[in-house]
């Protein structure tokens, strides 16, 4: 789950990590009220969407007067914004964050994440903040420093001071940096996070460090014990079909192709998409209907797939280990009847009660195309889509 900047800053502040004073507003007049409550300007007005790169998209404005604040908020609120991170998708701007704006002396980068390569929690820091860390890694890798955390020792003050001096900070600032690192580790563990990125972590004109922006990513597998984080979810920033799928407990990800996929098992689902591409097609989605799929879940899965008008064909690829193929067949037949499927449907069944399942499909009288294996199914759905065009 992703978070808005203002939510990230609330969490950072709760754990003693300095952030500029600020508050969200949903109207231009409210933005002015927030600015006045923060005291004398200047201020920053920042559009709240689940994406970085807002500055280049016009979503971050420096304001010297309250008239500037009102104008900036008026221009952002109620609009839709896309950045280089949204892949062309426009996200609604329902809130703006108004904060104090100090003069930036130096921008740093600091993040903490789960490093799958080293199987540890890892800090990454750089003296080059305010830009994409991937760009720094490609152009000046010597400016990036990392620390793999020992789970027994944890993070100590000396780790942070060592990092701080490597980044060119003075003794006072290195001490602040150490405090931020230690507190960030507590936050990371307490909230079951997968990533916290502070970019930039800035030195302002008062000589102190502040987190000017924060990006959080939580571990959805821990959502059951993080009710406060779940309550922060903003579904307006997410793909509508993916939101519906999550409510049905179906693993679904929208993609750009035209061949819908319904598969049981994440590994088989990924393999199915690969084979479709190898046969010249483009998958429209990742959909893992789950090992405990039943007739109703199959119907709901078809509805999810066909909610996209880009879908021109469907490939159902089921290996019946826990799930029974005859039950899947009943679900497919019911879905075709209930949803009114008008695109080619190719079905590959294998496993428990496979012959009964295939017989049900044959007896249905529906134009369902059978497939012998995954490659045969991918070829047939690609050909069927081409022939139907």
Swiss-Prot record:
One Pfam family linked to the record: Ligase_CoA
Keyword tags: ATP-binding, Ligase, Magnesium, Metal-binding, Nucleotide-binding, Tricarboxylic acid cycle
Reactions catalysed, as given in the entry: succinate + ATP + CoA = succinyl-CoA + ADP + phosphate; GTP + succinate + CoA = succinyl-CoA + GDP + phosphate
GO biological process: succinyl-CoA metabolic process; tricarboxylic acid cycle
Pathway recorded for this protein: Carbohydrate metabolism; tricarboxylic acid cycle; succinate from succinyl-CoA (ligase route): step 1/1
Annotated substrate binding sites: 264, 321-323
Protein residues bound to Mg(2+): 199, 213
Similarity remark: Belongs to the succinate/malate CoA ligase beta subunit family.
Protein known as: Succinate--CoA ligase [ADP-forming] subunit beta
Organism: Xanthomonas campestris pv. campestris (strain B100)
